Amino acid sequence: MKKAILGKKVGMTQIFSEEGEVMPVTVVKAGPCSVVQKKVEDTDGYNAVQIGFEDKKENKTKKPEKGHFEKAGVNPKKHLTEFELESMENLEVGQELTVEQFEVGDQIDVTGTSKSKGFQGTIKRFKHSTGPKTHGSRFYRAPGSLGSMDISRVFKGQTLPGRMGGNTVTVQRLEVVDVDKENNLLLVKGAVPGPKKGLLKIVDSVKAKS
């Protein structure tokens, strides 16, 4: 991993390619982020960088957090995330990271939290088939059999009703279509996980093809 940044999902729109084809894109406000801490293999056992995104009011920042940010010489941040990087020679504590590190055509991996759907049944949650709708049937949206009579228990992993969504999801090999350096915006081809204003982690793709 060579590039990393935090951002928020603005929404989706569409643009036209040079060939005149309609292209669905997601607008992401990425950065600016500040380097809060560097971890090196000699002292921490691995190489990583901790970056912060979005300023936070000082009166809402706890004392240990204040000391952490003051040591780095940056304003308190709402979001802190650590990324393991191959090379950190060009990164220094207090440095600002922007969308300028990305270029049109780059392939990236975007991680976010999927939209929460609340408590849902098996038909919505796992795409189960419904029961018959006629001839006095009372079996329409029920989950059905959970196992045989002899075992007298339910096996682990059975598809049952429960909380749906709100999971960490990563979409790989998305293409950067445009970079707006003035407004810190990335236009990414396709959809990314999560709702509008959802936090996103953006890194260069581990499966990038040249």
From Swiss-Prot:
GO cellular component terms attached to this protein's record: cytosolic large ribosomal subunit
This protein's UniProt keywords: Ribonucleoprotein, Ribosomal protein, RNA-binding, rRNA-binding
RNA-binding found in the keyword field: yes
Domain of life: Bacteria
Lineage: Bacteria, Bacillati, Bacillota, Clostridia, Natranaerobiales
Entry keyword Lipid biosynthesis: no
PANTHER family reported in the protein's UniProt record: 50S RIBOSOMAL PROTEIN L3, LARGE RIBOSOMAL SUBUNIT PROTEIN UL3C
UniProt function note: One of the primary rRNA binding proteins, it binds directly near the 3'-end of the 23S rRNA, where it nucleates assembly of the 50S subunit.
Pfam families: Ribosomal_L3
GO molecular function terms attached to this record: rRNA binding; structural constituent of ribosome
HAMAP family, sorted: Ribosomal_uL3_B (MF_01325_B)
Species for this entry: Natranaerobius thermophilus (strain ATCC BAA-1301 / DSM 18059 / JW/NM-WN-LF)
The protein's name in its UniProt record: Large ribosomal subunit protein uL3
Family membership noted in the UniProt record: Belongs to the universal ribosomal protein uL3 family.
Oligomeric and partner information: Part of the 50S ribosomal subunit. Forms a cluster with proteins L14 and L19.
BP terms from Gene Ontology: translation
